[in-house]
Regions:
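The feature marks proteins involved in alpha-glucan
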Residues: 1-32, 61-139, 143-151, 158, ...
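Short proline/glycine-enriched turn/loop motifs at strand-loop junctions of beta-rich domains
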Residues: 36-43
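Hydrophobic pocket-lining residues within nucleotide cofactor-binding pockets
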Residues: 40, 145, 168
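Beta-strand-rich interaction surfaces with strong enrichment in secreted/lumenal proteins
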Residues: 56-59
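Residue-level detector of conserved catalytic or cofactor/ligand-binding positions
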Residues: 161-169
Length: 170
């Protein structure tokens, strides 16, 4: 009897919750890291938690090419990158494609982040109108959508005043 393996299901295209499998997850005593790099010879993680040492935290390869490791003492808010040695021996420092947060430009590191927000909109959620049909959703890349006249980028807080979300009309 086959056992369900979430990583294999993701590789096969039948698991749509990859954000639960990969990335950095803060735990009480440190952070667990997980990244898919099936052709890598080795994968390390470095960051603020080890003064960006390139040899401090080696990850272990699983049979599906998923590399995992735990960094004691690492915590939310710290920056990190993966150091990936390719099959050809080349070494690249990469941001985490499943990171929940990232460093502000021009930096490119990922940021350890938690999703521990206590939502208080229960009353609003209970009273909202249910959407009974298709919706159009427009997406823009906020980092490149608009700039100040001097060429600098807007912060998220500056962009908030420009965003308009409207309720559907019937």
């Amino acid at each position: 009897m086959d056992t369900y393996r979430p990583e294999q299901a993701w590789i096969d295209g039948t698991n749509f919750d990859a954000q639960k499998l990969f990335g950095a997850r803060a735990e009480p005593n440190g952070v667990s890291f997980s990244v898919w790099a099936p052709n890598a010879r080795s994968v390390r993680v470095t960051g603020d938690f080890c003064s960006w040492s390139d040899s401090a935290h080696w990850l272990s390869r699983g049979d599906l090419g998923v590399w995992r490791g735990f960094v004691p003492g690492a915590r939310a808010g710290q920056l990190y990158k993966y150091i990936i040695e390719g099959a050809d021996g080349s070494v690249v420092w990469k941001a985490d494609p499943f990171a929940l947060a990232a460093e502000v430009r021009p930096g490119t590191a990922s940021r350890i982040h938690t999703l521990s927000y206590n939502w208080t909109d229960g009353e609003w959620m209970a009273g909202r109108r249910a959407l009974g049909g298709p919706r159009n959703i427009y997406e823009v890349h906020a980092g490149s959508w608009r700039r100040h006249t001097d060429g600098s980028f807007y912060t998220w807080y500056e962009l908030l005043s420009l965003i308009h979300i409207s309720e559907p009309t019937r």
